[in-house]
Amino acid sequence: NWKLTVELIERAELTHIFEGKDPNYKEITFFAPPSLSILRYVWDKASGKEQFPGDPDRWRALSEDEKNHPEHLVQALDKDWCREMVLRHVIKGKHLKDEIAFRNRDYEIEAEEQTGGTDFTCESGNKLRAYREKTNYGGVTDAGAIFMYLYSFDAMEMVPLASPDIQPLNGVVHALNYNYVLGRI
């Protein structure tokens, strides 16, 4: 489900990038957080576990019914925070799964010696390494599925992708897994 992802993009006032209407962003790659990741993040923040990334008065002003409708939760978030969060997931240019290098299995993905993967800098400045890995099948090495992952140098965390290579008109969307924690990229 992408409802809250769209809400986050709209709240950030970045729809022009996703619609291909910005001349600086003719094509983009979007590592898309699913709605569940956004919802979980906002509820955790709103429940007081951590500082809410928006106006606490706007949050408190929401009725209980509004708090149960996720689109209202996103509207309570700070626009600049939403912009930063969306841009942490955007790279200029279209980068398909098949263009991403395989990880060198001799080294951990974050190791200096790692010669595999493809390094990117997102539009907010955070650094990622995208990489593919082959799996074994039926006892045959590398005969199984090929998965794509991200490694965030900022968060020092590996992020699995659920569905790579969704191709809208102006780029590519790589859907992040449902267990992705918003901002850990």
Model-derived features: positions:
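Mature, structured domains of secreted/extracytosolic soluble proteins
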Residues: 1-185
